[in-house]
Amino acid sequence: MSCFESSKFLKNPQTMNQAVLIKACQELGWKYEIRQDEVIILNANQKEDLKGEYLLKVKGDVVSYNNYYMKNAKEFVTELQETFFKLNVVYAKETILKEFEAVGFTFKRDFDFVPTKEEVERFYMVGYSKIENEEENKTEIQFTILNDGTVITDSNYIPEDIHKLADEAMLKMDEAFGNKRREGIEIKRKEVPIKYQGKTYCSANGQLKSTIKIS
């Protein structure tokens, strides 16, 4: 995560973190079982009767879908897509919370956010710098979750120590989403205001270069 950056996290449907999936299922009220090293989703409150078959299962972090029902009627496929989108939204939020809280960030609601058909959640993860004499020690990174589980982040100035922690969390998010963001495609750099151009790590490519002193 760089200063003045917007990133997009796209969910790879073939990859899921089991711990996050279990928490998402609990949040959604879905029925699941754990069998050895597999998490198996048996019921997602869908209208269609699966006749005792599973909806999806995850072994390691690899997802397998029930191919029989994936090939079924168009209406059911549409319903399943809506079901999986709900899962992706909760999965996305749980992933963000898990990885950013692990490096010391805290959750902050966006009380001004009004959900739309496309944008369903928005909130901030907040971190505090420990750099000596840092004038802007508080960092808020904005997260917007779209209706299909895509995550869009937005940041402005980030102190260097928080920058490194956010980088760590973002890399873990890449792993959980099963996609690696690409510079200039999913990662977009914003123009750095003149005030911050002297900060060597607020560079065009987001690379850290300076040395910090933490009190």
Regions found by a protein language model. Give the residues of each.
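Interaction-mediating elements
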Residues: 1-215
